[in-house]
Regions:
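Conserved phosphate/anionic-ligand binding catalytic regions in large, soluble enzymes, centered on
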Residues: 27-29, 122-140, 330-353, 435-455, ...
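Conserved small/polar residues in nucleotide/adenosyl-binding loops
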Residues: 667-669
Length: 669
């Protein structure tokens, strides 16, 4: 039986243990913080799939209902497809792990995490990342870790490490930081327009904090780590690579500097086809088409990087810090509540905003705690035609969910408080064309669509992505680098970094960093933040030219929401016996009425147009009002007796008029 080992990062309150569960996995670790516990395993396939030309890493995180002492909903009473949160946590874990596997290691690797228990106080995503790193460290899988992960908040100007769910309500920062011993590996999160200088301070602070969990993983690996296996590393045969270089010559450089993305791809494919025929003739039965694809990846990367590092020349002719041409249009569609088209180079997003009522909010059934619902949603759709292809369509991919979440948390900080603007808001970004940074186009288009809908945001939010091209020395350190602003798809693919930063003129609202190299030095990170801030201001200038402030009125077809305060003692009168009065008002006006359950007397009215809203307000005033002496009312005679008439002056309020008080010349009974 395996021996149990425990290590603890005391300041962080995180405990790592192994030796109890999953003894046959490559590596298995249980991570706990408070009473929240996550199990993570890491296992690699022993053989390579035939024709494998990419690294098949799969990271899956699942939350078990048993962790919260609950039954799954639905007929089958079993966990189903992964939730949005599970997908986002899986992606969060995948991104910092991937760059640390050896180049050429293409065996399938599975990292699987389960939420085993939750105290609904401590979040599990940070535990998943630390557990995955620890599982790989003690496994037989080659991996250049460890990494440490921490969540950082800021409350009243002070950084808070791994804040609880309750503390996050008061935090102006939600930073998830992942780093190695010396450098950062991945960041993501949001902030309430935090200044760039403070943002960098948060990164440096978080890097110091993770050192304890990194040391704990190293200690665990020393106690029980398995010997690393020798796996076959896939490499392009030198003779194939040399022949392809000989055939392409300078033609590859000519191909990648074609005017458009499609022309570049056509030119590269033509050169590739010629090289493929030459290799087939030379190598005969030993010819492998996969080797051609791998060789051309290497050659294209060399040409892209050489031109940027030596000549400062990018594929589309821009200098490293240049933006592509930007155009902004608003109000592009009828009837919708808000619409905008944001175009940057060959990237284009059609963004639509819709206003709804409190009945349209999205309920959140988070097992680990947090908000019960959210009234702002941003959905991102990436159809295959946006890259000129035919492909899978109809279901949201993990990538679409991840990009939508990034854009959503970047726009959220600029929205007005719900007590000032009590609408549910949904933004949908339809990507019409893609050549890099579509998620950032969604942020810019989303801001324009909000203003076009009349949502009272004080200023625009914009986003842009920076890339990086590096040259390493013999010690594996960065000897030369160039930071690129507004990267296109090829620069993302062949480059070393994708660093997205969103914000207003006042500060940062959202961010995400992904790397292909094994760490980003802080001096380069600071350079990238400075460069992306300058670019963001230029984008905001363009957006302000298109629509400098929000529309003063909501669109004609947008719902109307009003709040009125009534005497709490009149709530019963408004509802009526068995809900009679409130049903009548709804039927007569077409408006929906919600009464706060706290007996405060706050009433919300939801109507499809202004006329229905005014009628509903009038009806509520009549029902909850008092009959005033000396005021003339137009009433309805509800009953007539010999001694007088019963008259309804206000809804539900009748009075008796005696015959001897009526001064009428003629009364018909």
């Amino acid at each position: 039986m395996n021996q149990k080992h425990n290590v603890t990062a005391e300041k962080l309150g995180i405990q790592l243990s192994t030796g109890t569960l999953a003894g046959l996995a490559g590596g298995a670790v249980t991570v706990a913080m408070g009473e929240t516990t996550v199990f993570v395993s890491a296992t690699a396939a022993s053989t390579l799939r035939p024709g494998q030309d990419f690294f098949p890493l799969t990271v899956d995180y699942r939350e078990k209902f048993t962790a919260a002492g609950r039954f799954p909903g639905g007929y089958f009473k079993r966990e189903g497809k992964p939730s949005e949160k599970e997908i986002l946590t899986s992606r969060l874990c995948d991104r910092p792990l991937r760059p640390l596997f050896p180049k050429g290691f293409l065996n399938e690797v599975q990292v699987i995490g389960y939420l085993l228990s939750t105290d609904q106080i401590n979040e599990a995503d940070v535990l998943m990342v630390n557990g995955a790193s620890a599982a790989l460290m003690i496994s037989d899988i080659p991996w250049n870790g460890p990494i440490g992960c921490v969540r950082l908040g800021e409350i009243n100007g002070e950084f808070v490490v791994n804040p609880t769910n309750e503390q996050m309500y008061d935090s102006s920062l939600d930073l998830i930081y992942v780093g190695s011993e010396k450098e950062m590996m991945m960041i993501e999160g949001s902030a309430d327009q935090i200044p760039e200088a403070r943002f960098v301070e948060a990164l440096e602070f978080a890097h110091q904090v993770i050192q304890e969990i990194i040391s704990a993983q190293c200690e665990l690996a020393e106690l029980c780590g398995r010997e690393k296996k020798e796996f076959e590393l896939v490499k392009t045969p030198d003779q194939v690579l040399d022949l392809c270089r000989e055939i392409t010559g300078n033609r590859m450089e000519e191909a990648i500097f074609a005017p458009s993305k499609q022309e570049r791809q056509v030119a590269v494919d033509a050169v590739k086809e010629e090289a493929s025929k030459a290799c087939e003739e030379k190598f005969g039965e030993d010819f492998d088409p996969d080797h051609i694809s791998m060789a051309f990846e290497i050659i294209q990367e060399e040409v892209y990087r050489e031109n940027i590092l030596i000549r400062g020349k990018r594929a589309d002719g821009r200098a490293p810090a240049d933006l592509r041409e930007i155009t902004c249009e608003t109000g592009v569609l009828p009837r919708v509540h808000g619409s905008a088209v944001f175009t940057r180079g060959e990237t284009q997003s059609l963004v639509l905003s819709t206003l709804g009522t409190s009945r349209d909010v999205q309920d959140l059934d988070g097992l680990t705690g947090g908000p019960a619902a959210k009234s702002f949603i941003l959905h991102y759709n990436f159809p295959p035609f946006s890259v000129g292809e035919a492909g899978r369509f109809g279901f949201s991919s993990r990538r679409e969910i991840g990009h939508g979440a990034l854009a959503e948390r970047s726009v959220l900080p600029i929205l007005p408080p719900e007590d000032e603007f009590p609408y549910a808001i949904r933004i949908v970004s339809e990507i019409m064309a893609s050549n890099g940074s579509t998620s950032m186009a969604s942020v810019c288009g989303g801001s324009l669509a909000l203003m076009d809908a009349g949502v009272p945001i004080s200023q625009h939010v914009a986003g842009i992505s920076t890339g990086l091209v590096t040259e390493m020395n013999d010690q594996g350190e960065i000897a030369k680098h160039v930071v690129l602003t507004d990267i296109i798809g090829a620069e993302d693919h062949f480059g070393d970094m994708d660093f997205k930063v969103c914000g207003t003129r006042d500060g940062v609202t959202g961010f995400q960093l992904d790397l292909k190299i094994q760490g980003l030095p802080f001096d380069i990170a600071k350079e990238a933040v400075k460069q992306v801030t300058e670019a963001r201001m230029k984008i905001l200038d363009k957006m302000d030219e298109a629509l400098p402030s929000h529309r003063k009125e909501l669109r004609e077809h947008a719902p109307r929401i009003e709040s009125v305060q009534i005497d709490p003692e009149k709530i019963g009168a408004l509802i009526g016996p068995g809900g009679k009065n409130i049903r009548r008002i709804t039927e007569v006006t077409g408006a929906n009425i919600d009464i706060d359950e706290d007996n405060s007397g706050k009433v919300r009215i939801y109507a499809t147009d202004t006329e229905a809203m005014n009628r509903a307000l009038q009806e509520i005033e009549l029902v909850t009002g008092e009959i005033e002496v000396g005021k003339i009312y137009r009433g309805i005679v509800r009953g007539v007796k010999e001694f007088g008439a019963f008259v309804e002056c206000l809804p539900g309020k009748e009075g008796l008029f005696l015959v001897d008080t009526l001064q009428l010349s003629l009364i018909h009974i």
